[in-house]
Every structure is written in structure tokens, then in C-alpha cells.
Amino acid sequence: MPIITLPDGSQRQFDRPVSVLEVAQDIGAGLAKATIAGRVNGERRDACDVIEQDATLEIITAKDEDGLEIIRHSCAHLLGHAIKQLFPDVKMAIGPTIENGFYYDVDLDRSLTQEDIDAIEKRMLELAKTNYDVVKKRVTWQEARDTFEKRGEPYKMAILDENIERTATPALYHHLEYIDMCRGPHVPNMRFCQHFKLQKVAGAYWRGDSKNKMLQRIYGTAWADKKQLAEYLTRLEEAAKRDHRKIGKALDLYHMQEEAPGMVFWHNDGWTIFRELETFVRTKLKQYDYQEVKGPFMMDRVLWEKTGHWQNYADLMFTTQSENREYAIKPMNCPGHVQIFNQGLKSYRDLPIRMAEFGSCHRNEPSGSLHGLMRVRGFTQDDAHIFCTEDQIESEVTSCIKMVYDIYSTFGFTNIAVKLSTRPENRIGSDEMWDRAEAGLAAALAHNGLEYEIQEGEGAFYGPKIEFALRDCLGREWQCGTVQLDFALPGRLDATYVAEDNSRKTPVMIHRAILGSIERFIGIITEEYAGFFPAWLAPTQAVVMNITDSQADYVQQVVKTLSDAGLRVKADLRNEKVGFKIREHTLRRVPYMLVCGDKEIAEGKVAVRTRKGADLGTFTVEEFAEILKNQVRSRELKLLNEE
């Protein structure tokens, strides 16, 4: 007679084993209708699964994150059901959930077209609208293998052969005539899976191995209701408009080309933004008492073997040879910073030493993963390494966190998700050391008044870390900042300092990145601002234009005055109508357009418009120069009189 304890502490006793759904029915018909699955003793279970002993139970509905993930997973099965009806010879591989959706890898002897995808989606909806029950059956390993052998599914057979113990009892989910295998749970009925959209097809190797066959990966998104789906598709449309690759081309910021995959060709305007970011971060480095250094571009293999990179990171490192020596182009800056620390004897009185670099790094990322500025092979890290004692961890991390928020707020990022990753099973150092390290990070987060999510076991083997993910205007998360403790690398590279008792001790190293990759950060802010960069970042801050040729000399004088004030200004003296010029520079997202006609010349002024079409009136050149200089100096996000 199981006793079921519900989340509110109330209990229900049954005279026989009961399923999750039966408990929901006992609570109420409305809850039963909404039940997707349950969490039994903290473990997700299907609605049909039977509870035989006393247990805690939470009912999972479409309102829960878990419920939404289950809907998405079941939509992957629905996709399998539909494609099998339309293309009976297709072979099904894997169909997991991903952020906001799902995919299914399929093996088909023809390339799927957009018309095919539309037909599959239509069939999925037709099937889901029949509201059929999903039937779960536990079978022996051999029964599962026989089932898929009979159905001609070699990939399912391979999963059984290579990933599932012979003693296991796999779960087969029956969608009418279609059968799939999964850990589950899945929806009990397809009425939960009627708000989805198939999005695209891409290539994907079986098992992610380029030596295996290339499959077709069909991506989709799924939501709990029509409103959520519509809102998500609207966000996708907005994201497409904000795509940094599209805006980067329109604004002539940069380009990529096949001869240098994953490497950026910065054009003048994009490089201007890049240098402004560097200048801004440098002011913060000075404010937070960092020294700036520059390490070599590549180092001998011997050093990378000492750090462990050669053994664990070789696939991502570019290498070259010279005079019978093998070198690796650096994928990160930390080993070089330890070499700088090692020059000269250090005392505990010298610590902490905060060492920053705009380091040019290269990683041999797979070509299929490259994506504009967001995923590149050559990038500039704004990282730093702090060498300190264990006693200084909390205060140094506190300072790092303060710096992270200080910098992010300048760009308008105030919604930041914070995660603390703790000790993994495989780690170096004693439990006491990890206790102190994790406590130090937690105390620093508390000192800054931050809420955070704990990621158990997600720390690196050499130390715990804090991650900072920016949430942008579309609700997307971008993981940029990290504060990582490292108890391993300084020791591997023989870094020591003279302690207060005259013994030699190994310093703790704190890895600290804020923007992360400058290239990627430019991609992020390009999409966040939709190319409407604040005045301090805008490549051209103002364009001065004439109405007729008679104002050309005055325009040149205005440009000189503003340029001499340190502003980035251009003249537009083309023989075009002023309305045409305004439209063109508006499309180029230039913050301010200054029009000079005979009236403005007579008054010694300029008529000022913004890129959003606001007419700000007339100003003397000196007045406008002071306004724009103040905006740049204070790094304001909005233009004059902009809401």
C-alpha cells in the first residue's frame, strides 16, 4: 500500500500499486488531463509508470520546464512517425532535444528539399491531431534488437549493440505503427504535441565522426501552446534581422573568406569598434590595478606538454615546425603569463599580481562549427591571470566580479545569469583545498549580493569556477565571463613565491575573462544593438552634409572642428539631394546627421538629426561638439533626447 507524498507535504495512501496518472486522477480530473509525466523520488517517469512503494511525487505538466522538454522529445518521435510514412525506406538514427527544440538524424538516399520538410510537418500535424495514445513497453535487449532488425533500422541496432547492456530492458514507445526506443519519459497522448515547426535540414555525421556516413539532421522547435510558438517564431524573425553577419556586411565591418576559414578580415569601421573596446577595457584594467603584458604567439611543444595541453588539447591546436623543433600556436594565454611571473623571485608581499593581455589566440575548431564572429579560429581574448595566495582568493574574486558587472553595465547588459561550478569526481588537490576554494567563490558572490545556480561537478579538474551569461534583448544567453580558480598550472610550470615563513609556495592562479573573445563580443553587441551602436562605439559618429555646393567650405570647417575635438566625423559633399543623403546614412546607422544650409551658415550653426529620424534643432558647432564629446566620454547608450 504505497503512500504518495505530494510537493505540499500532503499524503495519499493507495491499496495497490498506482501509476503516476492514477495519482493525478485521484487528485482531480483537471490535473489528470494536464499530466505529461511525473517526478518520482526526484526521477522523471512516464505517466503510465507504476509506483509500488512509498514515494514522493511531483506531477509534470506543460507549464514546467521538464514538461516542455518532454513535449519536444515526443515531437522528435512524431517526426520519425511522419517521415516513416512518407519515406518508408528512411533509416532513423537519433532524435534528442536541444535548446528550444529537437532534431532527428535520418539516413535517406535523397536530399530533403523544403517541399519535403513542409510535407513532413503537415503529416506530423495530421497525426498529432488524431490524439493517439503513446504506448510504452519494456522489453528485453534481444526483443528490442529483433524489433529493429525486422524494421530495418541499423542505427537503432548499433545503439543497442554498442551502448546498451545485454541485461537491460529498453523502453519501446509505440506511436500507432511507428516504434522508437528511448529512455523517456514521453507524453501519454499526442494532444500535447500540436504546436511545433520544422526549421531546417543540415548535414551531420553518425556519432559525430567524420569517418562515418553523413546523415541529414532535421531541426524543429516545439512549444506547449500556440501563443508560445508564435512568440518564439517572432523572436527568430527578429534574430534574423539582427544577424551580425548580415549587419556586418551592410555596415562594412568585416568579412570572412574561404582562404582563411574562421579568421576575420576587419575593415576600417569594424576595426574602429574593436579598438574602442580595447581602449575601454584598458581604462578598466588601470582602474582595477592590472598590469598589461604581451606573450609570444607560439611556443615550443615542450612547454605545452608540461601544461597538459599537448596531451588533452592537441586536436584544437595549430602546429608548425622550424629547425627540427615543433611549435604550437597558442590557444590561450595562461602558460605565457606563468612564464612572465617566473621571471625574478616573488615574495608574498608582491601578491596579488594581476596580469592582463589582449592575446591573439587560435584554435582549430571544426569547420562545420564556424559561425561568423560567434565561432572563429583566430580571436583576441581579453583575459587576465591573477597570482595570489589562498587567503586572497575571496577578495580577488570579489574584485573580479565587481569588474565584470562594471563592464557589462556599460553595454546595457544587466540581466546576467551566474553559475558556480563545483568539484568534479576526477580532480586534483585535497577536499580541504576544494572546500576553501568553493567557499571563497561562494563568499565572493554573496559579497556582491548575487544569486547563482550551482552546477554540481561541473568545475574543471584543477579548480571551481564562476560563469557569467549575458541575457540579450531576445532572451538569449551568451556565456562570456568566467572566473576560474587553478591549483594545477602554476605548479606544473614551477611557479613559486617566498611565503612569510621563508618557505617556497605555489601561488593560486585565477583565470579571469570578461568579454571573452573580442570578436564574439562584437558579434553579440551588433545583434543586441541591431547595428545601432551607441555614439562612443559607432565607427562614424556624425556625418556633415551640404544642401548645395555653396555650403561645401562650411561643411569642411565643421568637420575639421569636430575632428579636432577627437570625434569621428565625415563630410558628404556629393551632388545628391539632402533627403537621399539622410536616408543613406540612416541605413548606415550613423548616430548624428548634421545638415548645413545657407540659414545654418548665417547663424554659425548646424541642424542636427538622429538616425531614428528625430529633429534635434540647431546648435553651434562648439555646442554640438561638447554634447557629443560628453556622450562619448561617459559612454552613454542612448543618443541625445532618445528614449
UniProtKB/Swiss-Prot annotation:
Provide the TGS domain boundaries: 1-61
What is the protein's name according to its record? Answer: Threonine--tRNA ligase
Q: Where in the cell is it found?
A: Cytoplasm
List the Pfam families hit by this protein, alphabetically: HGTP_anticodon, TGS, tRNA-synt_2b, tRNA_SAD
Q: Is Aminoacyl-tRNA synthetase among this UniProt entry's keywords? A: yes
One GO cellular component this record assigns the protein to is:
cytosol
Q: Which organism is this entry from?
A: Haemophilus influenzae (strain 86-028NP)
PROSITE patterns reported in the protein's UniProt record:
AA_TRNA_LIGASE_II, TGS
Functional summary from the UniProt entry = Catalyzes the attachment of threonine to tRNA(Thr) in a two-step reaction: L-threonine is first activated by ATP to form Thr-AMP and then transferred to the acceptor end of tRNA(Thr). Also edits incorrectly charged L-seryl-tRNA(Thr).
Q: Where is this region: Catalytic?
A: 243-534
